[in-house]
Amino acid sequence: MGTSTAKEAHALIASLRSAYSATPTKLKIIDLYVVYAILTAVVQVVYMAIVGSFPFNAFLSGVLSCTGTAVLAVCLRMQVNKENREFKDLPPERAFADFVLCNLVLHLVIMNFLG
């Protein structure tokens, strides 16, 4: 029972890897940025758990900035992906401009929250 499950898991990972290898480089860069933003948020949470959260608004601002940026990057990835039929009429330049504008608004709110 356990070996068939392990084989299925290995086959699943192999199929995911082969499908992801066909992904365009632009999307892989966005994926890398999303992973970086999430890992930065995780590092901040671990640091808060170990050291403490004395300036809690600073901790909250950092985590919300990281997760908000990751969410906006996922939205950018959805809009730039050529296989996504929902945004096929949207030019990539417009999607990137939306991403930059939303990031600007997000970080203005974060800076306002910091005080």
From Swiss-Prot:
Residues 53-55 are lumenal. It is a multi-pass membrane protein. It is found in: Endoplasmic reticulum membrane. Keywords: Apoptosis, Endoplasmic reticulum, Membrane, Transmembrane, Transmembrane helix. Residues 1-31, 77-94 are cytoplasmic. Pfam families: DAD (PF02109). GO terms for biological process: protein N-linked glycosylation. The chain crosses the membrane at residues 32-52, 56-76, 95-115. One of its GO terms (cellular component) is oligosaccharyltransferase complex. Pathway: Protein modification; protein glycosylation. Belongs to the DAD/OST2 family. Subunit of the oligosaccharyl transferase (OST) complex that catalyzes the initial transfer of a defined glycan (Glc(3)Man(9)GlcNAc(2) in eukaryotes) from the lipid carrier dolichol-pyrophosphate to an asparagine residue within an Asn-X-Ser/Thr consensus motif in nascent polypeptide chains, the first step in protein N-glycosylation. N-glycosylation occurs cotranslationally and the complex associates with the Sec61 complex at the channel-forming translocon complex that mediates protein translocation across the endoplasmic reticulum (ER). All subunits are required for a maximal enzyme activity. Component of the oligosaccharyltransferase (OST) complex. This is Dolichyl-diphosphooligosaccharide--protein glycosyltransferase subunit DAD1. It comes from Picea mariana. The lineage of its organism: Eukaryota, Viridiplantae, Streptophyta, Embryophyta, Tracheophyta.
